[in-house]
Every structure is written in structure tokens, then in C-alpha cells.
Design a protein with these regions (language model features):
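Glycine-/small-residue-enriched transmembrane alpha-helix faces in small-molecule transporters
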Residues: 1-33, 131-162, 183-185, 209, ...
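Cytoplasmic-side transmembrane-helix entry/capping segments in multi-pass membrane proteins
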Residues: 5, 58-68, 110-122, 142, ...
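C-terminal-most transmembrane helix of multi-pass membrane proteins
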Residues: 35, 39, 242-283
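Hydrophobic transmembrane alpha-helices of multi-pass small-molecule transport proteins
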Residues: 46, 112-132, 262-282
Length: 283
């Protein structure tokens, strides 16, 4: 399970970097179109992974909300947050996902669960104490908009983990991705910006490689989540959704696309300690 998780984390980081680069350098970029293309690749790779067929009695409304909370809203809101202020606000909000899942499911906050969440929340606090976006030319509305987008991501993923079926999870996730593809298809109204289309046609091999790698990474993450639901508490599984923003921030710093702050070491260390200490087994 560690290898697919590593592939998923690196794949997500690569996708985040490329998508952010497109948004910064091409104002005509459609984030809906880019996410739709990636989800198509994810859908194809997920159907390669075998899963048991099951007779679902879920309503169409349940399927719509399942795909909306699991893929459509988190992807778009996370991208908007990063586009406005960078990755640090998004990173600071990640510990709220397992915390809210705990509160929603009625799990007891004690022992290592409480200690782990405290360390993760200290990581969040360290981001806001140092305000590491001060060197960016940001306006106040951008920070507030990023806060709203990050809140949407956290609340939607919390709802998704709460309603996530614990049996035959991969089957439901496959159909959830399919629902997200249909939703984004209607939202973007089959719109491909001319600049992005020209760039894609000029370097089709590069774009195909990026989309494929991103699709494999996300498919691996979905497989890890579906496999872990039967062996881990659902709040512990939610931690898997918290990894790729941290990986992307670290990769941006390494590639010198973002300004390195010594406080980043404190933040990442506290988050890592919290998630390592967090109890994983479903006892």
C-alpha cells in the first residue's frame, strides 16, 4: 500500500504544479476543462482495477452528491485556493478534514487520536502565526476568497468520507468519478481555450504524459482509500487526502517556485508527527 500511496502523492504534486503553471501563464486556461481531462484518465485507470459488482439501491440524488462532494467540489475549490494565495492556506486547512470526520462520526477524541490531532493543529497554527504569504503581492479579498475555497474543500471532503460506503468501496468510487466527469462536462460546456489547445497540439506527448501520470496518481490514491476503509477508521483514511498539498508545497520549494520559509519546516514536521501518531487500525 505504501508504493501506491507514494505514487499518488507524487502524481498529485506533479499535477498541481502543472495546473498552477498553466493558470499563472495562460489567463484563458479553463480549470474545469483541465480537471475534466484528468478525471477521464482517472476513470479509465480505475476501471482497470478489479472490483466486485454490487446491486446498489442508492438514489440518483445520492450518487450526485457522492460525486460532487468527493471529486467535483474539492478539486475546483482546492485549485481556486492555490491559484489565489499559493499552497500554504490549503495546507493549513488539511487537519480539519480528519477532525470534522471524527466529530461527524461520533468517534471518541482520546489517546493517540487526540495527541495526533493536536500536533496537526499546531502545524496549522504555525502557518497562521507566521503569515508566510506576506512577501506575495496579495489583496485582502484574495485571502478571504482563498479561505472560503479551502473551507468548501474541507467541508465537502468531510461529508464525502462520512457517506463513503465501507463495503465494496472501489465500486462506488468508480461510479463517483464517472458522475464527476458528467458534472464537469456540463459545467464547462465543451469549452477548450484556444491558447491551451494550441499548446496541447504543439506538445501532445508532454501533455499526454502529464495527464496520464496525474490520472495514475489519483487512481492509486482512490485505490488506497478504498482498500483502507475495511482496515482503518474512516477518520484515519481521511488523512490520505491531506498528503498531496504538503507534497506540492515541498516540491514547489525544492524547484524554487516558491519562497522557502524556515517556518515551513516547523509546519511540515508538526503535521508529519500528528499523522504518524494518529491511530490507523480499526479496532
Amino acid at each position: 500500500m505504501l508504493l501506491p500511496l507514494l505514487v499518488a502523492t507524487v502524481g498529485h504534486a506533479a499535477w498541481d504544479n502543472v495546473l498552477h503553471w498553466m493558470i499563472v501563464n495562460d489567463p484563458d486556461t479553463s480549470i474545469f476543462h483541465m480537471h475534466w481531462l484528468r478525471m477521464v484518465i482517472v476513470y479509465l485507470f480505475m476501471w482497470i482495477i478489479p472490483s466486485k459488482k454490487t446491486k446498489s439501491t442508492r438514489s440518483l440524488w445520492w450518487w450526485f452528491t457522492f460525486s460532487l462532494y468527493g471529486w467535483t467540489l474539492p478539486a475546483i475549490s482546492y485549485t481556486v485556493c492555490v491559484m489565489l494565495t499559493g499552497y500554504r492556506i490549503a495546507v493549513s486547512f488539511q487537519p480539519f478534514i480528519p477532525l470534522l470526520v471524527v466529530l461527524q462520526t461520533g468517534a471518541v477524541l482520546e489517546g493517540y487520536r487526540l495527541v495526533g490531532l493536536n500536533f496537526a493543529m499546531l502545524g496549522t497554527l504555525s502557518v497562521w502565526v507566521w503569515s508566510p504569504w506576506y512577501h506575495k503581492d496579495l489583496e485582502l479579498w484574495q485571502i478571504w476568497a482563498a479561505l472560503f475555497a479551502a473551507t468548501v474543500q474541507v467541508l465537502s471532503l468531510t461529508k464525502w468520507f462520512v457517506i463513503l460506503p465501507r463495503e465494496n468501496t472501489l465500486y462506488y468510487m468508480k461510479h463517483g468519478v464517472g458522475g464527476a466527469i458528467l458534472t464537469l462536462f456540463f459545467v464547462m460546456i465543451i469549452w477548450a481555450p484556444e491558447n491551451m489547445s494550441a499548446d496541447f497540439l504543439a506538445k501532445p506527448d508532454k501533455w499526454l504524459l502529464v495527464l496520464t501520470f496525474a490520472g495514475i496518481g489519483t487512481a492509486c490514491k482512490n485505490w488506497v482509500i478504498s482498500s483502507a476503509t475495511s482496515r482503518m477508521t474512516i477518520d484515519a483514511v481521511a488523512i490520505f487526502e491531506c498528503l498531496h498539498p504538503v507534497a506540492t508545497l515541498c516540491s514547489d520549494i525544492i524547484l524554487q517556485k516558491d519562497v522557502f520559509e524556515y517556518e515551513d519546516i516547523v509546519t511540515v514536521t508538526l503535521l508529519a508527527i500528528g499523522w504518524i501518531l494518529y491511530p490507523k487500525r480499526n479496532i
